[in-house]
Amino acid sequence: MQVLVRDNNVDQALRALKKKMQREGIFREMKMRGHYEKPSEKRAREKAEAVRRARKLARKRAQREGLIGGRPGAR
């Protein structure tokens, strides 16, 4: 991963690097690899994440179709 340092502005380059790493999911991966995760725990975690994603998608679809309201005062 590369970040350009312009005009010796290291702080700006560090912020850009952190943003890229966050977008790529590197911090999350480092956290997950910090300790061993049993295969059964991994399956359970992935299944829970899939359920969470499906619920979020269903909620967004329902909001888009007008079945449920969004945030209060959003309209």
Swiss-Prot record:
Residues 52-75 are annotated as: Disordered. One of its GO terms (cellular component) is ribosome. GO terms for biological process: translation. It comes from the Bacteria. Keywords: Ribonucleoprotein, Ribosomal protein. Residues 53-62 have a biased composition (Basic residues). GO terms for molecular function: structural constituent of ribosome. Coiled coil: none annotated. It holds the Pfam family Ribosomal_S21. NCBIfam families: S21p. HAMAP family: Ribosomal_bS21 (MF_00358). Belongs to the bacterial ribosomal protein bS21 family. This is Small ribosomal subunit protein bS21. It comes from Brucella anthropi (strain ATCC 49188 / DSM 6882 / CCUG 24695 / JCM 21032 / LMG 3331 / NBRC 15819 / NCTC 12168 / Alc 37) (Ochrobactrum anthropi). The gene is rpsU.
